[in-house]
Curated annotation (Swiss-Prot):
Site entry (Transition state stabilizer), positions: D77
Protein name according to UniProt: Uroporphyrinogen decarboxylase
Main EC class the enzyme belongs to: lyase
Subcellular location as annotated: Cytoplasm
Subunit structure: Homodimer.
Organism from which the protein derives: Pseudomonas syringae pv. tomato (strain ATCC BAA-871 / DC3000)
MF annotations from Gene Ontology: uroporphyrinogen decarboxylase activity
Pfam families found in the cross-reference section: URO-D
UniProt-listed Enzyme Commission number(s): 4.1.1.37
Keywords of the record: Cytoplasm, Decarboxylase, Lyase, Porphyrin biosynthesis
Length: 354
């Protein structure tokens, strides 16, 4: 494989010295970019973008052609796994993801297959190897998956949910069924991420988007325990380099100490945490990724720059910080503001890496 020309993202994750704080954005390939909207129109719909490795590669690289980002992230969706389990993923315009089938009983869950990463999700592995080849060492490529709890909520609810009524009812009424579902998902995610690593992903992130909706006790038992299983089963070295693992629970600021114990290299933070406090709490164990409120990107460039400066100062000197948003960039953001954000991180962070 081609040598990396810019490895500061991987170095920061592993707490090795860097020249400036690396930066990338969750959903950096997305609807805020006119070139992405054009590609999506050419592909026909969102799933065609995901399932065609050439389109997935094209949109993964678009933000890198526009901005000096320090990492690329595979263009895909967390719901590829439930789709491969036979639930029939589709997208309603303006509605978000839906499933043709849901799971509601122990029998439904027992009948679910564990997808084979190469056979059932081969299009994702093809996308990873295509992107890695096209990147040609520019920056590292991040692979990703949803956490078991987050995937389970979509499978039980049949789509997005505000209150997770059905998923939580199953968790409390029928914990045996929920544990079986989460166990199958943990096995599926482990083999899926390992497939991505073998196809060329140089770091992986587990997105626990809905872990923060749980009580403390339920979070430990139904979300964190299964992420620990995944982390323990991942390939941690490939191609002569360590493969860092990032775990991101949105709304997980209460539980950073517990999350830092599961063996991941890096904790993702949402914008409700103070990154300086997070560093004091867990910085001796893990590196940190985050954590600007994505809606700051609707403000003027000077205000964006000020907020970047505040977060950098809060983290302080030294490595172990990858700058990111506290959640995904939203569709109405002006691409120029995203550029102002990325430039501000590089320009203002050099002083912290003398």
């Amino acid at each position: 494989m081609t040598a990396l020309k810019n490895d500061r993202f991987l170095r920061a994750l592993l707490k090795q010295p860097v020249d400036v704080t690396p930066v990338w954005m969750m959903r950096q390939a997305g609807r805020y970019l006119p070139e992405y909207r054009a590609s999506r129109a050419s592909a026909g719909d969102f799933m065609s973008l995901c399932k065609n490795p050439q389109f997935a590669c094209e949109v993964t690289l678009q933000p890198l052609d526009r901005y000096p980002l320090d990492a690329a992230i595979l263009f895909s969706d967390i719901l590829t796994i439930p789709d491969a389990m036979g639930l029939g993923l589709y997208f309603e315009t303006g509605e978000g993801p839906r499933f043709k089938k849901t799971v509601s009983t122990l029998a439904d869950i027992e009948a679910l297959p564990i997808p084979d990463a190469q056979q059932d999700l081969g299009y994702v592995m093809d996308a990873v190897s295509t992107i890695r080849r096209e990147l040609n060492g520019r920056v590292p490529l991040i692979g990703f998956a949803g956490s078991p709890w987050t995937l389970a909520t979509y499978m039980v609810e049949g789509g997005s949910s505000k209150d997770f009524r059905k998923s939580k009812a199953m968790l409390y009424d029928n914990p045996q069924a929920m544990h079986l579902l989460l166990d199958k998902l943990a096995q599926s995610v482990t083999s899926y991420l390992n497939g991505q690593i073998l196809a060329g992903a140089q770091a992986v992130q587990i997105f626990d988007s809905w872990g923060g909706s749980l009580s403390s006790a339920a979070y430990q038992e139904f979300s964190l325990a299964y992420m620990r299983k995944i982390v323990n089963g991942l390939i941690r070295e490939n191609d002569g380099r360590k493969v860092p693992v990032i775990v991101f629970t949105k709304g997980g600021g209460l539980w950073l100490e517990s999350i830092a114990e599961i063996g991941a290299d890096t904790l993702g933070l949402d914008w409700t945490c103070d990154i300086g406090e997070a560093r004091q709490r867990v910085g001796n164990k893990v590196s940190l990724q985050g954590n600007m409120d994505p809606t700051v990107l609707y403000a003027r460039p000077e205000a964006i720059r000020q907020e970047v400066a505040r977060i950098l100062a809060s983290y302080g000197s030294g490595t172990g910080h990858v700058f990111n948003l506290g959640h995904g960039i939203t569709p109405e953001v002006d691409p120029a503001n995203a550029g102002a954000f990325i430039n501000a991180v590089h320009e203002l962070s050099a002083q912290y890496h003398q």
